């Protein structure tokens, strides 16, 4: 059935829709099944995403038609389709009237992902007006709160040197805490790897007190504050809160040094929002494990990593992983930096839409996945600043001298970039950074030809 007369209006102007502030706009790459009309398929997509179905129904009235989602732009050659969703379509909380991300996902990337006449459809960007931003929580804490704890300026406080306890599984409580202590002697921030939780060989109630003791000992030895991001992800929100409450009790007066990690893609929006609302005094660390099944460039359905990052800021993530922009082991490219810019700035041009955030707090780009000191200068060149958290597991625990030396090498890499120095020359005056060349020789060979001769290192 051709629904284009109802669910498409190509006379609508995007600028006018944005100025009106009464729609969420979504941009997709969409292709219909072979032989089908593009606009008809797009209109069916909009119908399925709002008030319609595959037939006319007798219960439709004039009010219903007023909240139809409308296709307002198509370009079949480039597979571009844009839809305007009236705000009235979206579900609101009965407790406080706020928007729910699950409603946005249900409509904008819900049933439409399995439609029989659609070959593929992937959301590449969306625009939310000021009213919608006001009706989401947004972050309660941001990187400035961590800089303050670390004794740094709260503006442009710089690189936070972090790690992930490795190996990701298999460490019992005492070795786990010792691994944390060894890194904290040189670094700032440790996160649980996302599978780490309450395994039978390392129960939280035994492990976490030992981790807190390691944090205090490292602080005493270095005279510097340390931070820990604890994984509270669980199927049951009561279990998640039980883990968080135990952690707060354990850390006591040092609770401000405790972040809560939620594996937000697998855990879902409800888990992220629960953590944000129940624990507004904690830095909310959004890990996105599993996202690649829909965000990967090889996937033509779902949504992009930039869309996920924008959603995380609306929900209130203090920080979210953004990959390594082609400099680590994970899939990505240099132009992924727009993802970082989108969540850290008050306004930013996305792939399609210019988004203003109207003063809500920023979300920190967290960089992780195969990074080490040798890869960081190039990463910073691409990003253009160092106001991030980097969690380098192998880059710390794979350093030949110690995890602490690995942490120091990461910091020295940032200082090298900030000084505009040549990494080889910098290494001659900074031992931990120099030893990173020997620790990661394959990266050294690829990035710094002739480094062995220049640093006097034998083959």
From Swiss-Prot:
Its EC number is 4.1.1.39. Pfam families: RuBisCO_large, RuBisCO_large_N. Its cofactor is Mg(2+). It catalyses: 2 (2R)-3-phosphoglycerate + 2 H(+) = D-ribulose 1,5-bisphosphate + CO2 + H2O; D-ribulose 1,5-bisphosphate + O2 = 2-phosphoglycolate + (2R)-3-phosphoglycerate + 2 H(+). The active site is at residues 166, 287. Gene3D superfamilies: Ribulose bisphosphate carboxylase, large subunit, C-terminal domain, RuBisCO large subunit, N-terminal domain. Keywords: Calvin cycle, Carbon dioxide fixation, Lyase, Magnesium, Metal-binding, Monooxygenase, Oxidoreductase. Binds 1 Mg(2+) ion per subunit. This is Ribulose bisphosphate carboxylase. It comes from Albidiferax ferrireducens (strain ATCC BAA-621 / DSM 15236 / T118) (Rhodoferax ferrireducens). The gene is cbbM.
């Amino acid at each position: 059935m051709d629904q284009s007369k109802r669910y498409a209006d190509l006379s609508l102007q995007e600028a006018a829709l944005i100025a009106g502030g009464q729609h969420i706009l979504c941009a997709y790459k969409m292709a219909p099944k072979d032989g089908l009309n593009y606009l008809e398929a797009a209109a069916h997509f909009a119908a399925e995403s709002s008030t319609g179905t595959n037939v006319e129904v007798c219960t439709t009235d004039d009010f219903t038609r007023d909240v139809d989602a409308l296709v307002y732009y198509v370009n079949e050659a480039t597979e571009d389709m844009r839809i305007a969703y009236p705000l009235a379509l979206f579900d609101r909380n009965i407790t406080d009237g706020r928007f729910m991300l699950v409603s946005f996902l249900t409509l904008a990337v819900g049933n439409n992902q399995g439609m029989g006449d659609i070959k593929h459809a992937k959301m590449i960007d969306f625009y939310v007006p000021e009213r919608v931003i006001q009706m989401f929580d947004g972050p309660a804490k941001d990187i400035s709160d961590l800089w303050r704890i670390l004794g740094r300026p709260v503006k442009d406080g710089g690189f936070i040197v972090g790690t992930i306890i490795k190996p990701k599984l298999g460490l019992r409580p005492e070795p786990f805490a010792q691994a944390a202590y060894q890194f904290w002697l040189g670094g700032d921030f440790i996160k649980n790897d996302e599978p780490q939780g309450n395994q039978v060989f390392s129960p939280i109630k035994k492990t976490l007190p030992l981790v807190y003791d390691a944090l205090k000992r490292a602080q005493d030895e270095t005279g510097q504050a340390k931070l820990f991001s604890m994984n509270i992800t669980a199927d049951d929100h009561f279990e998640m809160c039980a883990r968080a409450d135990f952690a707060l009790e354990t850390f006591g007066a040092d609770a401000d040094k405790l972040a809560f990690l939620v594996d937000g893609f697998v855990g879902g929006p409800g888990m992220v929002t629960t953590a944000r609302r129940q624990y507004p005094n904690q830095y909310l660390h959004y890990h996105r494990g599993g996202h690649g099944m829909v965000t990967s460039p090889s996937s033509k359905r779902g949504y992009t990593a930039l869309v996920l990052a924008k959603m995380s800021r609306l929900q209130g993530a203090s920080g979210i992983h953004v990959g390594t922009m082609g400099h680590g082991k994970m899939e990505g490219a240099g132009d992924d930096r727009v993802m970082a810019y989108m969540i850290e700035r008050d306004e930013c041009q996305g792939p399609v839409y210019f988004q203003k955030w109207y003063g809500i707090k920023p979300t920190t780009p967290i960089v992780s996945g195969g990074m080490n000191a040798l890869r960081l200068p190039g990463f910073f060149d691409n990003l253009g600043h160092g106001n991030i958290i980097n969690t380098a597991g192998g880059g710390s625990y794979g350093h030949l001298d110690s995890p602490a030396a690995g942490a120091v090498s990461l910091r020295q890499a940032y200082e090298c970039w900030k000084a505009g120095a040549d990494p080889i020359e910098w290494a001659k005056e900074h031992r931990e950074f120099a030893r990173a060349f020997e620790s990661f020789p394959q990266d050294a060979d690829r990035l710094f030809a002739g480094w062995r001769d220049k640093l006097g290192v034998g083959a």
